[in-house]
Amino acid sequence: NSVHPCCDPVKCEPREGEHCISGPCCRNCKFLNAGTICKRAMLDGLHDYCTGVTSDCPRNRYNH
């Protein structure tokens, strides 16, 4: 079994100095910059963007 390079296998959390393990707003163990598109617009015409502080891709706050 290979260990994920971002993951501390004992604690099951990001290694010291790293931000994240995986997710649409995580790349190379770091959060993507705020404003990076993490989900392209579909029917509503609004993209979803990374916040720079989480690996999740939050829904565009202007979506109804």
UniProtKB/Swiss-Prot annotation:
Organism: Echis carinatus
GO CC field: extracellular region
Quaternary structure, from the entry: Heterodimer; disulfide-linked.
Highest rank taxon of the organism: Eukaryota
Keywords: Cell adhesion impairing toxin, Disulfide bond, Secreted, Toxin
MF (Gene Ontology): toxin activity
Residue ranges annotated as motif Cell attachment site: 42-44
Family the entry assigns: Belongs to the disintegrin family. Dimeric disintegrin subfamily.
Cysteine disulfide partners in this protein: C6-C29, C20-C26, C25-C50, C38-C57
Tissue: Expressed by the venom gland.
Coiled coil: none
InterPro entries registered for this protein in UniProt: Disintegrin_CS, Disintegrin_dom, Disintegrin_dom_sf
Localization per Swiss-Prot or TrEMBL: Secreted
PANTHER family: ADAM A DISINTEGRIN AND METALLOPROTEASE DOMAIN, ADAM METALLOPROTEASE
Protein name per the record: Disintegrin
SMART domains per record: DISIN
Domain Disintegrin residues, every copy: 1-64
Function in brief: Inhibits adhesion of cells expressing alpha-4/beta-1 (ITGA4/ITGB1) and alpha-4/beta-7 (ITGA4/ITGB7) integrins to the natural ligands vascular cell adhesion molecule 1 (VCAM-1) and mucosal addressin cell adhesion molecule 1 (MADCAM-1).
PROSITE patterns referenced in this protein's UniProt entry, alphabetically: DISINTEGRIN_1, DISINTEGRIN_2
